[in-house]
Amino acid sequence: MKTIYFVAGLFVMLVQGSWQRSLQNTEEKSRSFPAPQTDPLDDPDQMTEDKRHSQGTFTSDYSKYLDSRRAQDFVQWLMNTKRNKNNIAKRHDEFERHAEGTFTSDVSSYLEGQAAKEFIAWLVKGRGRRDFPEEVTIVEELRRRHADGSFSDEMNTVLDNLATRDFINWLLHTKITDSL
C-alpha cells in the first residue's frame, strides 16, 4: 500500500512539473518576440500592462505553490492514516470520546454490581431467610415419576429449589468482603 501512495505522489509531482514546463515554454516564446521600435517604452499603458502581467504571473505561481502544498499534505495524510492502523491521527487520540453505547454498557455494569451488593447485604441481614421444606418431602418429590417412567418437570423444579437453598445457606454462612 505504501508503494501505491508513493507512486501517486510521484505522479502528482510529475504532472505538476509538466504543467510548469509548458507554461514556462509559453512565456519564453512570448518574450522572444522583439518589441517594435516604434512603440515608446515609457508609455503609461505599456507599464500598466507589464504590471498586470507580473501580478498575474505572481498569482499564478502562488496558486501553483498552494496546489502543490495541498497535494503534499494530502499524500502525507494518506501515509499517516496508513501508519495508524485504526485510521485515527495521533493528535486526535487525546480527544477521542467513548461511544454512547460503551458509556451505557459501563453504567449498566456498574448498576448491576451495585444491585448485587445490595442483594447480598439484604441476605446477610437476615431478611431473605425463609423456611424450606424438610428433606423428607424433597426426597418424596424426587421419587415421583410420570406414568411413562420419565422424570417430570417437577424434578427440575426440585433440583432448582435445592440449588437455591444451598446457595442461600452458603451466602448466609460465608463472610462477605467488600471486593464485590
From Swiss-Prot:
GO CC terms of this entry: cytoplasm; extracellular space; plasma membrane
GO MF terms, alphabetically ordered: glucagon receptor binding; hormone activity; identical protein binding
Predominant location category: secreted
PROSITE patterns per record: GLUCAGON (PS00260)
Marked site positions, Cleavage: 52-53, 83-84, 91-92, 97-98, 130-131, 145-146
Disordered: annotated span: 25-59
InterPro entries: Glucagon (IPR015550), Glucagon_GIP_secretin_VIP (IPR000532)
SMART domains: GLUCA (SM00070)
Tagged with keyword Phosphoprotein: yes
Keywords for the protein's UniProt record, in alphabetical order: Amidation, Cleavage on pair of basic residues, Hormone, Phosphoprotein, Secreted, Signal
Prodomain residues: 84-89, 131-145
Localization (cell): Secreted
Other observations noted: GLP-2 does not have cleavage on a pair of basic residues at C-terminus as in other mammals.
UniProt protein name: Pro-glucagon
